[in-house]
Regions:
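Coil-to-beta-strand transition motifs
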Residues: 61-62, 161-164
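Short, small/polar residue-rich loop motifs at catalytic or cofactor-binding pockets
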Residues: 151
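Predominantly a Rossmann-like dinucleotide-binding segment in NAD(P)-dependent oxidoreductases
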Residues: 33-36, 43-147
Length: 173
């Protein structure tokens, strides 16, 4: 927001915003200042993802009806280094996949999302929180019986043309 208000176009790495209010602040500021604001997703540029996209565009897989993506990341050694424990605090208060675009970006490319198809229905479920409360106790020295985000989140998205994608996220172990 600051950069757009000071005349700069902005590229943002994920997570660019964590709440709907933060998302609307980015959109409204971009529209008001007439500056571009683009969320980047580094996972669409990896060798495997680009190779798979190239193969799909050449028709090697036929009609694609189902894709899966994931962000399974063991962050155990990094928890003490997050600024003000933002990530642990977010997981304690909210449920869902913080980095959905890591799995969703490549899947959307394969399914031509916003290039002929679009997401229509989303269902997300998670396991109970086992690791999160242990991390709060270890790093914040308090109990967290109210810890919200489960250890593993599964998201299913159906598209307008009835293809679907399955995303998995696991980041607390």
């Amino acid at each position: 927001v600051y950069s757009m208000e000071h005349g700069k176009h902005v590229d943002i790495e994920v997570p660019a915003a964590m709440t709907l209010n933060e998302i609307w602040a980015l959109i409204n500021t971009s529209e008001k200042t007439r500056k571009h604001c683009m969320q980047l997703e580094n996972c669409v540029y990896d060798f495997f993802e680009l190779t798979t996209l190239n193969m799909a565009q050449q028709g090697l897989f036929g009609e694609i009806l189902h894709v899966e993506g994931a962000y399974i990341h063991n962050l155990e050694e990094f928890w003490p280094y997050y600024w003000n424990n933002w990530r642990l605090d977010y997981n304690r208060a909210f449920r869902g996949d913080i980095y959905a675009t890591h799995g969703m970006g490549p899947a959307c490319q394969l399914l031509d999302i916003h290039r002929g198809d679009r997401m229509k229905t989303l269902v997300a479920m998670d396991t109970k929180a086992v690791t999160g409360p242990k991390l709060v106790k270890q790093y914040q020295k308090e109990s967290a019986p109210d810890f919200q985000n489960g250890d593993h989140t599964m998201t299913f998205i159906r598209t307008e043309t009835v293809s679907y994608t399955h995303l998995r996220a696991h980041e607390t172990k």
